[in-house]
Amino acid sequence: MQSEMAIDTVATAEKSPLELLQQTKASVEAIIAKMLSIKQQGTPKSENRELLTQMFLNFINLRQANRSILIEEEKVRTETEIAKSPVDFTTLELHNLMYEKSHYLKANKASRDFKSRYPNIDLISEQDFFSDAPEAIKSQTLSNDSSHDLMLKRLNFELHQRKELCKLRVRLEQQKKSLLESNAERNKFLSSLPVHLKSLKKASLPVQSQLSLQNQKKLKYHNLAELLPPPLYVIYSQFMALKEAFEENIDVEVSGSLKDAQTYARQQAEQNSESLRLEVGVDEERQRKRLKKVGSDEGGVYQVHPLKVVLHVYDDEITDPKSHELVMLKFEYLLKLNVVCVGIEESEDGLEKNILCNLFPDDSGLEPPHQSAKLILGNDHVFDKSRTSRPYKWAQHLAGIETLPEMSPFFTDKDIQYSDTAKGYASASDHRNVQTVLQRIRSQKKTKLTLV
């Protein structure tokens, strides 16, 4: 019996755990079947002890097989863990490579789809690269592929060129900054130059008067006179001609805002050009707009042109006439009424004592000089008495504003012929005579000074 057990133990040692487990299972089943048959047949139970011993031996073999299976399982698990580590590492590398691939594909697509501001700029040509690139770039070896290596070198050379251009840009910006500072200093000097020129001009006035040089004021007034409205220009030219022809003791100036006068002249030029472009079919609409504009400008009837003519009248009976100024007249032009108004500059006298009132018969300056002005002023036909300057008839004649008379010059009634109106028309020639106007102004002023 012991020899059989020893044989079984050696046999189990040679078999695999799984075969041993199956064999032990079959042996246990056979022993159990034998024990059941002994019990059923009623044979002596002396054999049961031997069967139990074999049963225990089989249990021992079963536990041994189970232990061997567990050891082998642990060994396989350990080997699996050892083999899994490089697989996981390889898998991670694969995912990284796939991610890099997708990133490169996206970057490649973005580069291909990129629309530059200068899409026609190509990479530097090979000929220019070999002729202009420095040896440090051409001697590099960046890739085993010759074409790819050449492309990388061309890109590096282009990068080198761009860096040099950036340095040049910095130098140019510094140069620009220095030039701007220099220009600022020069502008500062130029802005202060008019003050120095003004003081120099003021200091040179005595020299100019000694050398009889041309007066710069005269040129200035001539330039301003080009912007005068036609009536004021006629007055200015007549007084200047009188002064130059007869050496009359007067001074004529043009005063006012040059900027406003230029703006007004520009607006008039634009209106004239616009009126030329209008067609005949829009005459009615243009007339409605004109009527509407006149109604809206009712408050601006006394709108004055920006420039004025100032006349200085000196005493002609003393040695130094310019040392004694008799009166200073101001001629201004009313745009809406088309009349020239005259007033005494800086006069403290009332309008009743003004020497210009009734300088000629029936010419107080309160009545508009022509019918169009009367229609614009309305039913009263009265000029604004609060204004210091008035539209005298002699001023209109001096300015060349000629209108149709209210009464026909061919009178048939003797009473009408010798009326005040007829006398006024008879004196129109005196109105146009500049010397006569100056003589009367001097006479009125001297008479007033004598009475005072």
Swiss-Prot record:
Pfam families reported for this sequence: FmiP_Thoc5
Transmembrane segments: none
GO cellular component: THO complex
Assigned keywords, A-Z: mRNA processing, mRNA splicing, mRNA transport, Nucleus, RNA-binding, Transport
Name of the protein this chain belongs to: THO complex subunit 5A
Assembly and oligomerization: Component of the THO complex, which is composed of THO1, THO2, THO3, THO5, THO6 and THO7.
Primary role: Acts as a component of the THO subcomplex of the TREX complex which is thought to couple mRNA transcription, processing and nuclear export.
Family, per entry: Belongs to the THOC5 family.
Subcellular location: Nucleus
Record's keyword annotation contains Iron-sulfur: no
Listed GO MF terms: RNA binding
PANTHER family xref list: FMS INTERACTING PROTEIN, THO COMPLEX SUBUNIT 5A
UniProt record, GO biological process: mRNA processing; mRNA transport; RNA splicing
Tagged with keyword Nucleus: yes
Species per Swiss-Prot/TrEMBL record: Arabidopsis thaliana (Mouse-ear cress)
Coiled coil: none
Covalent S-S links between cysteines: none
